[in-house]
């Protein structure tokens, strides 16, 4: 008789295995290890934003009303950046600025750093969530890689740019009109629209929108009508073995339209991934350059000629003058502590400009 010796299959699970089983269990909303970062950070970031836009003024940091309580609406409310005098302080509630006083912390702009950092880590948690789920179901990680692009833009605009400047004050506030103002600031002080990295970003985003529209329309146009259902959702079984649209027909169509067309689905879809992700990454790199005050294209010869010849003007020289007007108006408004004084003749004339 043979006796088999070995460990019992019913070994006691350690704490890590128990936590892993619970976190990665198949449920309606997947939690996962990434959820330990994502859910708390997203909760606090959104909660801080809703609290700030509802109740908190920007009077002490920007001299502005910025909450629903003060009469703002969804487009004009914001969680505004801390004052310039606070530089790059983390503005912790228990720090030397607020000293545990929640009201003072809100007045100083503490909610902005709270929302910015929790929001940044929340986005990273969401990317890790995509990695984790992809690994669990044996998918490639391209979704997570693609999501790195908006994370790069967020981190560069909200964190790296103000770190390169004198303080968080120069980051965008979290609000619709506030971000519009930040865009105008970027144009006036950095000539952002003439920056090659911005140009690549625009090409990426608009090119991706065009590709998405073309791709969706082409697939709709070449669907196989192999079912008797009244619409696409009834006509096709999600587990069917055959493809639902004709790549050959699509290729022939676009070959006739443009003379060239994608003949490979992998290359087509990789290109749709590559265009927007690369565009957003280029924009993020450009903003890092602005943090270091790197300049955009300068056509100095045109500026010199325009200064010498009143009859010579280009769209570029007109834009340069417009940027000077933006700087003259915004600097005095946004930085009253600097006591900037500009001659009356260079300032805009009221609502009529």
UniProtKB/Swiss-Prot annotation:
Q: Which InterPro entries match?
A: D1/D2, Photo_II_D1/D2_sf, Photo_RC_L/M, Photo_RC_L/M_CS, PSII_PsbD/D2
Identify the GO cellular component terms for this protein: chloroplast thylakoid membrane; photosystem II
> Transmembrane region positions?
41-61, 125-141, 153-166, 208-228, 279-295
Query: What PROSITE patterns does the database record attribute to this sequence?
Result: REACTION_CENTER (PS00244)
Q: Which reaction does it catalyse?
A: 2 a plastoquinone + 4 hnu + 2 H2O = 2 a plastoquinol + O2
Against Pfam families, the record matches this protein to:
Photo_RC
In the record, N-acetylthreonine modifications are located at: 2
Q: Could you tell me what the cofactor note in this record states? A: The D1/D2 heterodimer binds P680, chlorophylls that are the primary electron donor of PSII, and subsequent electron acceptors. It shares a non-heme iron and each subunit binds pheophytin, quinone, additional chlorophylls, carotenoids and lipids. There is also a Cl(-1) ion associated with D1 and D2, which is required for oxygen evolution. The PSII complex binds additional chlorophylls, carotenoids and specific lipids.
The residues that hold chlorophyll a ChlzD2 are: 118
Which keywords does this Swiss-Prot/TrEMBL entry list? Answer: Acetylation, Chlorophyll, Chloroplast, Chromophore, Electron transport, Iron, Magnesium, Membrane, Metal-binding, Oxidoreductase, Phosphoprotein, Photosynthesis, Photosystem II, Plastid, Thylakoid, Transmembrane, Transmembrane helix, Transport
Instruction: Report how it sits in the membrane.
Output: Multi-pass membrane protein
Compartment(s) of residence:
Plastid, Chloroplast thylakoid membrane
Q: Where does chlorophyll a PD2 bind?
A: 198
Classify the main location: plastid
A GO term, aspect molecular function: oxygen evolving activity
Q: Which enzyme class, named as a word? A: oxidoreductase
Q: Which residues bind pheophytin a?
A: 130, 143
| Residues that, per the record, bind Fe cation | 215, 269
Question: What does the similarity note say?
Answer: Belongs to the reaction center PufL/M/PsbA/D family.
Name the job this protein performs: Photosystem II (PSII) is a light-driven water:plastoquinone oxidoreductase that uses light energy to abstract electrons from H(2)O, generating O(2) and a proton gradient subsequently used for ATP formation. It consists of a core antenna complex that captures photons, and an electron transfer chain that converts photonic excitation into a charge separation. The D1/D2 (PsbA/PsbD) reaction center heterodimer binds P680, the primary electron donor of PSII as well as several subsequent electron acceptors. D2 is needed for assembly of a stable PSII complex.
User: What remark does the entry add?
Assistant: 2 of the reaction center chlorophylls (ChlD1 and ChlD2) are entirely coordinated by water.
User: Subunit structure, briefly?
Assistant: PSII is composed of 1 copy each of membrane proteins PsbA, PsbB, PsbC, PsbD, PsbE, PsbF, PsbH, PsbI, PsbJ, PsbK, PsbL, PsbM, PsbT, PsbX, PsbY, PsbZ, Psb30/Ycf12, at least 3 peripheral proteins of the oxygen-evolving complex and a large number of cofactors. It forms dimeric complexes.
Protein name (record) = Photosystem II D2 protein
Q: Which organism is it from?
A: Cycas taitungensis (Prince sago)
């Amino acid at each position: 008789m043979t006796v088999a010796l070995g460990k019992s299959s019913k070994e006691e699970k350690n704490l890590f295995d128990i936590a892993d089983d619970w976190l990665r269990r198949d449920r309606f909303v997947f939690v996962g290890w990434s959820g330990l970062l994502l859910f708390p950070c997203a909760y606090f970031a959104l909660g801080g934003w809703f609290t700030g836009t509802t109740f908190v003024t920007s009077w002490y940091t920007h001299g502005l009303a910025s909450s629903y309580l003060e009469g703002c609406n969804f487009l004009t409310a914001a969680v505004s950046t801390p004052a310039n005098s606070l530089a790059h302080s983390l503005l912790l509630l228990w720090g030397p600025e607020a000293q545990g006083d929640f009201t003072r912390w809100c007045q100083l702009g503490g909610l902005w750093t709270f929302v910015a950092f929790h929001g940044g880590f929340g986005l990273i948690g969401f990317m890790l969530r995509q990695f984790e789920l992809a690994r669990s179901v044996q998918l490639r990680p391209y979704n997570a890689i693609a999501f790195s692009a908006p994370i790069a833009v967020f981190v560069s605009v909200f964190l790296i740019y103000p770190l390169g400047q004198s303080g968080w004050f120069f980051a965008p506030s979290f609000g619709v009109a506030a971000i519009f103002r930040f865009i105008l600031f970027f144009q006036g002080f950095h000539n952002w629209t003439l920056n090659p990295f911005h140009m690549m970003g625009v090409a990426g985003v608009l090119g991706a929108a065009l590709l998405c529209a073309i791709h969706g329309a082409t697939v709709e146009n070449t669907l196989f009508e192999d079912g008797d259902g009244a619409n696409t959702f009834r006509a096709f079984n999600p587990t069917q073995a055959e493809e639902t649209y004709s790549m050959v027909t699509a290729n022939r169509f676009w070959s006739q339209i443009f003379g060239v067309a994608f003949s490979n689905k992998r290359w087509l879809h990789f290109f749709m991934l590559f265009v927007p992700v690369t565009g957003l990454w280029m924009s993020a790199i450009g903003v890092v350059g602005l943090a270091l005050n790197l300049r955009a294209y300068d056509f100095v010869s045109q500026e010199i000629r325009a200064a010498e010849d009143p009859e010579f003007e280009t769209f570029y020289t007109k834009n340069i003058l417009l940027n000077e007007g933006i700087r003259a108006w915004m600097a005095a408004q946004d930085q009253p502590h600097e006591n900037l004084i500009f001659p009356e003749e260079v300032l805009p004339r009221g609502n009529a400009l």
